[in-house]
């Protein structure tokens, strides 16, 4: 378990939705190429209201960008990250749906309607992501005792304790 997040429309209504891999915010391009081949972060999205959903480039969690994807995502050669990418699959979501995808896949949230979604991120425990775990997202010991199968959280707590020792 890594954290939970709430996603909503940007404050600036002029902001366009943009293609990215979550790992691009923490790694340079060379390291991104390694990360997507070695580890994965699982992203679970549950919309609170109907929303335009997500757009994904299938298979990109296991391969590097082609020229078009790279240019758009990195805003090179006259492209911007909000440009359409051929091969993108839009997945509209209704309130209560569950979308599961790799955060390392090229993707973008689609803005519009009253977008509000709860996202849950789960990391590969073999990876070096424990420093991204937000303590505020972890259950207390009292909460853990009420969870029928707390192994996911127990694993994260164990990894965090190893980091601190």
Q: What are the roles of these predicted feature ranges?
A:
Residues 105-165:
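Non-heme Fe(II)/2-oxoglutarate
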């Amino acid at each position: 378990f890594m954290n939970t997040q709430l996603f909503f429309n940007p404050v600036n209504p002029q902001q366009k939705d943009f293609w990215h891999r979550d790992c691009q915010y923490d790694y340079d391009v060379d390291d991104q190429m390694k990360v997507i081949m070695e580890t994965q972060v699982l992203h679970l999205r549950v919309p609170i209201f109907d929303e335009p959903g997500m757009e994904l480039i299938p298979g990109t969690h296991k391969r590097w960008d082609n020229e078009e994807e790279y240019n758009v995502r990195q805003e090179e050669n006259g492209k911007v990250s909000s440009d359409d990418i051929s091969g993108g699959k839009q997945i509209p979501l209704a309130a209560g749906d569950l979308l599961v995808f790799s955060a390392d896949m090229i993707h973008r949230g689609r803005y519009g309607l009253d977008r509000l979604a709860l996202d849950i991120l789960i990391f590969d425990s073999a990876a070096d992501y424990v420093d991204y775990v937000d303590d505020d997202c972890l259950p207390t010991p009292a909460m853990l005792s009420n969870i029928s199968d707390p192994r996911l959280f127990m694993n994260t707590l164990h990894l965090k304790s190893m980091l601190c020792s």
